[in-house]
Amino acid sequence: MTKKQKKKLCQLQLNEIKTSDDPTKLSCSFVIFDFDVSHNNTVISKDVALEAASTIINKPIVAKYYEVDELNTSTDALGTHEAYLDTDKHGELEVKRDTAPIGVFTSEGYITEIETPDGKKEVLAADAILWSSRFKDACELLLEWYGRGININTSCEILYSNYTVQDGIEHLQSPIYFEGHAILNSEKRGEHDIVLPAYDSSKLLSFNELQRFERLVAQAATRQNNEEGEKMNKFRKVFELSHSDVRTLLYSQLDPTLDKESDSFIADVYDTYFIVNVYSWSDENSYDKYFKFNYTRTGDTVSIDFDSKTEVFMTRNWEEVVPEPIQSQLNQKDEQIKDLTKQVNQINKDKVGIEQQFNTASEKLVQLNSEVEQLKPYKEKHEKTLLEQKLSEKNEFYKAKFEALNAEEKFSTEEVQNLIHASVKQDEEGEKAVLQLNTMLVDLVSVPTETNTTIREFSSKRENLIPNDDSFESRFSQ
């Protein structure tokens, strides 16, 4: 029976972009990996890397480019591995990728040194060209990232058959073959998140993309095992170079418990348990199963509860294919949803502004109310002083009136004093009090009785009382 061939994803970094007089290409170089133990407890020695270095030349560099949402905006981005499960022309299941080749490696791998925070380190690197004239937008995006100092992440797949495990660390042996290289999205742009070779599910939503890629490869490998038989019995295992620390610790405890003719990859990690795909190619007991293990975490250490091992399976749903007219309507609805979402966001933004203004006004009102409460005693004192002043003026006014009428006793009565107090008020009661006081003063005025002194004299003669001549001359002439 032939040895099984395994596949692993390695992280690369775009190390350098060089200028060129040829406008059709963009020269660059990549750092593929170093020779230390990786985050998934795998190590490739310098000698093994040099033997495999010749297989990197002429291998494609691929990417999935997403155009800008609107012109002159920073919304374009790159994708992931864009893997999906499909069949080849013979009807056999395989993993395909929705990416396009945008360049090629032009050199074999070579050993070089790079500067790190811990000093110089030897790495395996390779030169490449990107076809800048044919993939202008994607190359411009890479140049933008490179110019801004953004770490450009890529990943490459390596195929290998031989390895040994020592102290939980997998040592890859020759032969190793480099297969393909994908440039990943390296910056949050629009709706596209950063895609890294390693994912922490509590921080990055895009973890699901690479996890889906792993499952697709595992499904293809499983069916390939079932269909090809022992002579062509092959499988694929795809996992990242840079797992999170928790995942790495889980691998370090789990892998030493597996048989030599079995392997695993951790599909999901949660706070208290994880799901692992374990597959064995043993002649006596070959299988491909998923298991759930509970684990606990204390600081930088984890402890797997192997007694909690439970076989699990993943479910899926069959969905109806949406016809193109309906899909077009759905796309229109999606655009409407985006527009409405923008409007809602703007409304929420305006709402926040109004709430801030309201809060400011409320704080000002509270401050003013506080100041009013502080000034209230002064106001009451001032009003009391004015009232006493008006009362004193009214009292002096009516006292003089009553004294002029020789009615001091009347002035001193409770009735008059109450009316004087009421006359100070600026309301109907005050007006009535003033009217009663004035009426009272009028009633106190006494008018003396006049004696008739008319003198009447009678004429002794009653003749010639009317002149005979009534002319003008007789009446007015001398």
Swiss-Prot record:
Keyword terms of this UniProt record: Coiled coil
Annotated coiled-coil segments of the chain: 326-419
Record's keyword annotation contains Coiled coil: yes
Protein's name according to its UniProt entry: SPbeta prophage-derived uncharacterized protein YonD
Organism classification: Bacteria, Bacillati, Bacillota, Bacilli, Bacillales
